[in-house]
Amino acid sequence: MEDGSVFAGRLIGAEKIAVGEVVFTTSVVGYPQTLTDPSYKGQIITFTMPLIGNYGVSEDQLESDGIKAEGVVLFEATFPSHYKSVMSLEEWLASSGVPGVARVDTRALVQMLREHGVMMGAIGPEDPAVLMEALRKSPHYEDVVYVDMVSVKEPVLLGEGRLCIGVVDCGVKRSIVREFLKRGVRVKLVPCRRTELAFDCDALFISNGPGNPKLLDFLSAKVSEYVEYKKPLMGICLGHQVIAMALGAGIYKLKFGHRASNKPVRDIRFTGRTYITTHNHGYAVDPRGTDLKVWAVQPDDGTVEGLYHERLPILTTQWHPEASPGPQDTRWVFDKFLKLVERHGH
């Protein structure tokens, strides 16, 4: 670890060194979706659930074309038993070139991260001194623009329908695209550095993605330009942060972030209900001094989880309403946004 701490375990997966920001998730299930979520690019994931790998790996659970996390830390990688499984977790990691460490005291590691905050770390088969040297030579997570590594390179057209949603791909999850497609709209995926290619759509959506949002001035500037058209705009996770930045909000880093599929979010504007939701974010928004209004908060720490605009058709969520993994109770957010598109998108 960056502070010199060493956690020993059994190497699984690829026999190589991986460096990344060490984070943790408290999700009990959903490790295939978690590992393939592009938002984890640049990070080493620690699973607090002690048994990971119970149901193997199946193609229909993946959120991208492969594992995007840099590495995995867990307590026990179990032998899989599931009729859809095509390989074990260990086999998947090895074939993907991703290292992992099992039999780690994950409780002690997570307690340290909660107390001192997330930090850089390295895992691999080498001595601690070699891992520390690799860590020193690697760029810090907060200084790398990861979205370029997970975005499409050229526009992609998907689906059929009267309405078109332009999706700026910062590392969009497959399940988000599916939520739009199953509602009968067309999706135009565009590279994160070519946002203007989606301006001709009925609405713009800024996707989830990895890394420090403060490095994405090139994207927030395009969003600011788009806002002038007064057309519908939505963002999830990183997209929520980018839209907030474009409208003047501040961004700050959380001590250890929200990464789980059991986080409560309270809707203080539309339904008045509290929902259990899926999260994966290490940064948060401070909208004070802007025209953005808060519609959802995380009751444990008061983090802003949803924003809207009283005069413009803008709606954002910091959490993942598509879930995958996790509760599906807030998928209605997509329906709410499409109603905005029906009213304002033509």
From Swiss-Prot:
Catalysed reactions, as listed in the record: hydrogencarbonate + L-glutamine + 2 ATP + H2O = carbamoyl phosphate + L-glutamate + 2 ADP + phosphate + 2 H(+)
GO cellular component, one term: cytoplasm
EC numbers for this chain: 6.3.5.5
Entry binding sites for L-glutamine: S39, G209, G211, L238, Q241, N280, G282, Y283
Classification via InterPro entries: Anth_synth/Amidotransfase (IPR050472), CarbamoylP_synth_ssu (IPR006274), CarbamoylP_synth_ssu_N (IPR002474), CarbP_synth_ssu_N_sf (IPR036480), Class_I_gatase-like (IPR029062), CPSase_GATase1 (IPR035686), GATASE (IPR017926)
Active site, UniProt feature: C237 (nucleophile), H320, E322
A biological process from GO: 'de novo' UMP biosynthetic process
Pathway assignment: Amino-acid biosynthesis; L-arginine biosynthesis; carbamoyl phosphate from bicarbonate: step 1/1; Pyrimidine metabolism; UMP biosynthesis via de novo pathway; (S)-dihydroorotate from bicarbonate: step 1/3
Keyword Heme among UniProt keywords: no
Record flagged with keyword Magnesium: no
Region CPSase, residue ranges: 1-160
Molecular function as annotated in GO: ATP binding; carbamoyl-phosphate synthase (glutamine-hydrolyzing) activity; glutaminase activity
Keywords (A to Z) from UniProt: Amino-acid biosynthesis, Arginine biosynthesis, ATP-binding, Glutamine amidotransferase, Ligase, Nucleotide-binding, Pyrimidine biosynthesis
Domain Glutamine amidotransferase type-1: 164-346
NCBIfam families (alphabetical): CPSaseIIsmall, PRK12838.1
Function: Small subunit of the glutamine-dependent carbamoyl phosphate synthetase (CPSase). CPSase catalyzes the formation of carbamoyl phosphate from the ammonia moiety of glutamine, carbonate, and phosphate donated by ATP, constituting the first step of 2 biosynthetic pathways, one leading to arginine and/or urea and the other to pyrimidine nucleotides. The small subunit (glutamine amidotransferase) binds and cleaves glutamine to supply the large subunit with the substrate ammonia.
Family, as annotated: Belongs to the CarA family.
Subunit record text: Composed of two chains; the small (or glutamine) chain promotes the hydrolysis of glutamine to ammonia, which is used by the large (or ammonia) chain to synthesize carbamoyl phosphate. Tetramer of heterodimers (alpha,beta)4.
Protein name as catalogued: Carbamoyl phosphate synthase small chain
Organism: Pyrobaculum aerophilum (strain ATCC 51768 / DSM 7523 / JCM 9630 / CIP 104966 / NBRC 100827 / IM2)
Gene: carA
